[in-house]
């Protein structure tokens, strides 16, 4: 072979070898037990884990692998191109020493961006981050929960104020002097120290959380904020709802995220199972980033305040959400949308389909713009929340307390809601108040007391083939108050309708 041919081939070979070496480096696995991590859960592995992540990231990425065993750690800071992999039988147990989550990091806590204790697993501005495997992440939350209950009690006993601040509370005050806080939210922030979310990826892209089991979260469990392209698949979340209850231990709460897919998850928690959020009040409007392009499918929700919830922190807006093929069994509510004056934000283009509900302790459906019952009527502005273009279909339910309600506000009625192909049995029916353009098509609401459908202060009601399988004697199935305008009724039994 001539020299002129050999030289390019040599350079090509070197180039190919370089690419192969880069691929190998990218896929390198770091076995934490072989690297010296204590698999008996006695000695903290925090420093070793984070040092290994830094090393892997400096080499282009890799997998941080935990074989069978129990590993004690505090905050883990993920980097780009890092996979945290827990083998079946591996338990990553997090410290319950509050100081272990210093220094403060930037995070969004209950819809407000602040400096606070680090989430248990955290990343900032990272790309391609994965948590995977059949192992268990244990947040060891009991001490955090007891602190929360004790702090609430102290604040209540001292007229809504903390009498003194401890070290961490004073650090929080010093770190957040410029934080803008609405009057409505000030009582919540009086704690001056805040339980960290279990997992918060902040301003990250290409996130995957799959197959792991997550238990005993100190606060919200999976809480990506300002992220794009998030996949959460096959995850089991168990936070106790009693004996003792883990307060505010929501399951999955994307906040101001885009392109989120949640599927095949099992969730039983001490608050809402899945909640879609986008910031609180002025702080949320300042960032102005909606939570949008969200799919939730094939999930089972057991104990929890709500099955799938939107709000109440939704000041940046929530748009284009599809919820399908889910079971709610034993939650307090099924589908719940909540907001209040002062929030602002638009919730729109929501689709709910093929849902089964059972043993719902409260309402199957809630659409509530009047979450703050003390608020007063005000001119429409950026502070005014909006619910519109929301459609629900193919829902069945039994053993339900109330079918639910719509509650708009005088200056902004809830608008453009439809309910179709439903068969629900409950103790009490459905009430709509301060709403426009509400449609029911092929809906059976069977109740034990009162009307199945009750409308007040509404404009534009369309009823097609609505009924009760067991009408109550001397009780209308549909009650329409005199302040309701523009009602269209077809294919209904007129003897079961009362128009006042």
Model regions: which residues?
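Bacterial Sec-dependent N-terminal signal peptides
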Residues: 1-30
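Extracellular/periplasmic carbohydrate-active domains that bind, remodel
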Residues: 24-500
